[in-house]
């Protein structure tokens, strides 16, 4: 549930980032809604798809431990995960860059600015989840270290 929320928020942020870059501002109608051929709409939905992929990178790093910091096991220590990350990045680049894939998946090329935005997502998700894990660890330690006098007598 938590990772789904983070992925959805990232996807929405990427969609609105693409709309904003095209000139959309709060209070104005979104570009291309209901018009599948609108290039702004296609780019915005491509960004939303790519954001899901990039969000999954942060999520897969985080889900390796339930409450311990991912840095305690090593961020890049799992070879299969590293290969999977490289594969999914290559796949999103292929379906956004090459016309045959663009036609099948209804995507458009992304700019370096777009990829810059997308590259911010994994560390952001990693940071948010590390904060959550630290809070869980702190609460767990407080519960385990609070000894009542009755518990000591047993």
Question: Which stretches of residues belong to each language-model region?
Answer:
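C-terminal transmembrane helices and immediately adjacent loops/tails
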Residues: 1-154
């Amino acid at each position: 549930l938590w990772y789904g929320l983070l992925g959805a928020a990232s996807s929405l942020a990427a969609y609105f980032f693409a709309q904003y870059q095209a000139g959309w501002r709060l209070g104005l109608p979104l570009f291309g809604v209901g018009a599948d051929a609108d290039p702004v709409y296609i780019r915005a939905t491509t960004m939303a798809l790519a954001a899901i992929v990039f969000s999954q990178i942060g999520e897969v790093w985080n889900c390796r431990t339930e409450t311990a910091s991912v840095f305690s096991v090593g961020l890049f220590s799992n070879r299969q995960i590293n290969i999977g990350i490289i594969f999914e990045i290559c796949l999103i680049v292929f379906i956004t860059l090459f016309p045959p894939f663009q036609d099948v998946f209804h995507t458009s090329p992304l700019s370096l600015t777009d990829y810059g935005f997308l590259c911010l997502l994994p560390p952001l998700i990693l940071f948010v989840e590390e904060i959550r894990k630290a809070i869980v660890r702190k609460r767990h330690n407080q519960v385990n270290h609070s000894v009542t006098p009755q518990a000591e007598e047993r």
